[in-house]
Amino acid sequence: MANVVVVGAQWGDEGKGKIVDWLSERADVIARFQGGHNAGHTLVIDGKVYKLSLLPSGIVRPGKLSVIGNGVVLDPWHLVQEIAKLRADGVEISPESLMIAENAVLILPLHGELDRARESQNSVAKIGTTGRGIGPAYEDKVGRRAIRVADLADEATLALRVDRLMVHHDALRRGLGIEPVDREALLAQLREIAPQVLPYAKPVWKVMNEMRKAGKRILFEGAQGALLDIDFGTYPYVTSSNVIAGQAATGTGIGPGAIGFVLGIVKAYTTRVGEGPFPAELQDADGERLGERGREFGTVTGRKRRCGWFDAVLVRQTCATSGVSGIALTKLDVLDGFETLKICVGYELDGERLDHLPIAADQQARCTPIFEELEGWSESTAGARSWADLPGAAVKYVRRIEELIQCPVALLSTSPERDDTILVTDPFED
C-alpha cells in the first residue's frame, strides 16, 4: 500500500480536485502541504458542486481526516467562512475530521493590503498575484517574524509577535504610502478568531507519522502547479512556495520515505492564469475555442485563463522535478471536434533547438514553440470509462503524450464527474 502525492504538472487548474476526490474515497487521511486560499478547486459529487480554496478535498467525505499542514499559510477568517459555507451545504466538520498544524503561519489583513499595494504600484512587471496575502505571509515566515497558529493560544505571546511584526510592516507601509498597522485592532481581531481556530490545532507531524505507522492510507494534496514552484517555475511569475512533490514531506512533517507514488495531474492542453511566459499559447480562434469548451475561468478569481496546445517539454520537465510515477490526463473531451491537434515538442531560441525551458526569464519569453501535428477526432470522448470507448485518434494522442513526456498515463479523466475515469494504474497499490 503506497501513500500518494498529487501535484499539478502544469500551471495549475489541471483538474486536481476531481482526481483527489476520486482517490480520497479510498484514503484515510487527505493532507494539504503548501499554498493558501489562492488556489481553488471544484468538486462535483452526485451532481452537487463544491468550490474549495483552502480546505482539503477530503473534507466533503465522511469518515476521513483532513489535514492542513505546516507548509500552508492560513487565513483564519477565510477558514471560518469556508467551514461555515460547507456546513450550510450539509458537510459535517469538527476537530475529529479537520486538523491544522500548530506551526502553520497565519495570513493577516496586513498581508493582503501589502500584496495589493505592491501589485497596484508595480506598473513595470506585475506578477499576477491574487492579492490575498499569500506571498507576504511566506516572506514573514522566512523572515522569522510570522504569527503562527499556536501563538493564538497565549495573549502575551501574541502581543509580542504583533509588535515584532509591526516594526517590519510599518516601515514597508510608510514606503508604499499606507497607513500604519492599527495594533489594537489587529490584536482584537486575532483574539476574536482564536477560539474558532484553536480547536483544530494539533501537532500534525506527530499525528501524520502515527497514521503512517498504523498503515493508514495518506493522500497528499498539492495546490497550483509545478510550473508555479518558487524554485523550478517560471520565476518571478510563480507562487511563493514550493509546489513540487518533495514539499509534501516538508509541508506536513513526514519523512520523504513515506511517499510511495507521485501522481502528476496534466490537462490535455495547456492553460495559464496571469502574467508570465507561455511558449505554446494560442491567441487565435483555436485558443478561444479551448477556453470556451474547457470553461477556463479561475475558481477563486474568475480570471480568464490563457490557453494553448499541450506542451510536452514543460510536462516532461515537471515530471522530472517532482519524480512523477504516472500522470492523470484530464479534459481530453475538450479536444473533441478539432480536425488537427498540435503538441509542442521543443523550443527554438536564437536559432538553437532546446529540449527544456531555460531558467532565465528573458530567454523563456523569447522561446518559440516547435509543434508536431496529430490527427484529431470528431467522435465524443466525454464520459468514456474504458479505452474501448475512445476513438482511435484519441488513443494515439494519449500514447504520443506518454512517449514525449517519458511518463505513463495512470488515469484518464473524460468529464468533471468523478466516475468518468479510466484507471490504468492504481496509485495506492505498491
Swiss-Prot record:
It is an enzyme of class 6 (ligase). It catalyses: IMP + L-aspartate + GTP = N(6)-(1,2-dicarboxyethyl)-AMP + GDP + phosphate + 2 H(+). The active site is at 13 (proton acceptor), 41 (proton donor). SMART domains: Adenylsucc_synt. GTP binds at residues 12-18, 40-42, 305, 331-333, 413-415. GO terms for biological process: 'de novo' AMP biosynthetic process; IMP metabolic process. Pathway: Purine metabolism; AMP biosynthesis via de novo pathway; AMP from IMP: step 1/2. Keywords: Cytoplasm, GTP-binding, Ligase, Magnesium, Metal-binding, Nucleotide-binding, Purine biosynthesis. InterPro entries: Adenylosuccin_syn_GTP-bd (IPR018220), Adenylosuccin_syn_Lys_AS (IPR033128), Adenylosuccinate_synth_dom1 (IPR042109), Adenylosuccinate_synth_dom2 (IPR042110), Adenylosuccinate_synth_dom3 (IPR042111), Adenylosuccinate_synthetase (IPR001114), P-loop_NTPase (IPR027417). The keyword Cell membrane does not apply. It is found in: Cytoplasm. Binds 1 Mg(2+) ion per subunit. GO terms for molecular function: adenylosuccinate synthase activity; GTP binding; magnesium ion binding. Mg(2+) binds at residues 13, 40. GO terms for cellular component: cytoplasm. Substrate binds at residues 299-305. Pfam families: Adenylsucc_synt. IMP binds at residues 13-16, 38-41, 130, 144, 224, 239, 303. Its EC number is 6.3.4.4. Plays an important role in the de novo pathway of purine nucleotide biosynthesis. Catalyzes the first committed step in the biosynthesis of AMP from IMP. NCBIfam families: PRK01117.1 (NF002223), purA (TIGR00184). Homodimer. Belongs to the adenylosuccinate synthetase family. This is Adenylosuccinate synthetase. It comes from Cereibacter sphaeroides (strain KD131 / KCTC 12085) (Rhodobacter sphaeroides). The lineage of its organism: Bacteria, Pseudomonadati, Pseudomonadota, Alphaproteobacteria, Rhodobacterales.
